[in-house]
């Protein structure tokens, strides 16, 4: 059976200070360094995490380098045993973000008003409510990337929606390179290293 919740242990500010990455005032200590994030995923399909990911997950060297695994939490509806296995066998260097817009696949800009195609009112509160239960269960606070596609980019209401369940950040496409929306970091999806 699934656990009630799968909390994540994030690196603390103190640990980052001890490693020399943060100054005492909480600002980043660059010291001429560049930083890179290893984002593993686009695991938005049960076939990916049940058939492909095990080859990566079972690699003996996993855990030597911090990795951000991006898995759609709604996959718990299709392959809960796989989701459970990854979380209970994660190393301290395995972190998790939600893949592809959150707990499901859509273009969230289409939920913002005005909704010219449907004429409906904003669907952002329904999206936040839907995502929140999955984020809380799986200990998620980051949305790995937000696919805008043909939809408008997120406006202030759209950013507020994501901040309500993804407070540690989102990575949309149609945004400035970096932005801080209230306290939520926003980094534009840009180039991939394949």
Regions found by a protein language model. Give the residues of each.
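Structural preference for beta-strand elements that scaffold enzyme active sites
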Residues: 35-37, 66-68, 95-97, 141-144, ...
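Sequence-level detector for tyrosine residue identity
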Residues: 6, 21, 39, 43, ...
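Active-site-adjacent pocket scaffolds in enzyme catalytic domains
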Residues: 1-16, 126-130, 134-194
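Aromatic- and glycine-enriched glycan-recognition loops and surfaces
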Residues: 44-55, 63-65, 74-87
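Non-catalytic propeptide/linker segments at domain boundaries
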Residues: 1-62
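Short charge-dense sequence patches
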Residues: 30-35, 66-77
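Metal-dependent polysaccharide deacetylase catalytic core of the NodB/CE4 family, i.e.
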Residues: 71-153
């Amino acid at each position: 059976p699934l656990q009630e919740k799968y909390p994540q242990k994030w690196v603390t500010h103190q640990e980052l200070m001890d490693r020399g990455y943060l100054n005492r005032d909480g600002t980043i200590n660059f010291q001429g360094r560049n930083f890179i994030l290893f984002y593993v995923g686009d695991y938005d399909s049960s076939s990916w995490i049940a058939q492909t990911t095990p080859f990566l997950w079972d690699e003996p060297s996993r855990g030597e380098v911090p990795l951000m695994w991006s898995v759609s939490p709604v996959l718990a509806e299709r392959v809960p045993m796989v989701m459970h296995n990854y979380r209970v066998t994660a190393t301290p260097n395995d972190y998790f973000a939600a893949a592809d817009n959150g707990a499901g696949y859509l273009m969230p800009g289409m939920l913002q008003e005005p909704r010219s195609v449907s004429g409906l009112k904003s669907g952002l509160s329904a999206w936040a409510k839907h995502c929140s239960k999955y984020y809380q269960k799986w200990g998620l606070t980051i949305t790995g990337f937000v696919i805008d596609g043909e939809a408008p980019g997120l406006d202030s209401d759209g950013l507020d929606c994501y901040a309500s369940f993804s407070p540690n950040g989102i990575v949309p496409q149609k945004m400035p390179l970096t932005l801080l929306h209230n306290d939520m970091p926003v980094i534009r999806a840009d180039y991939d290293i394949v």
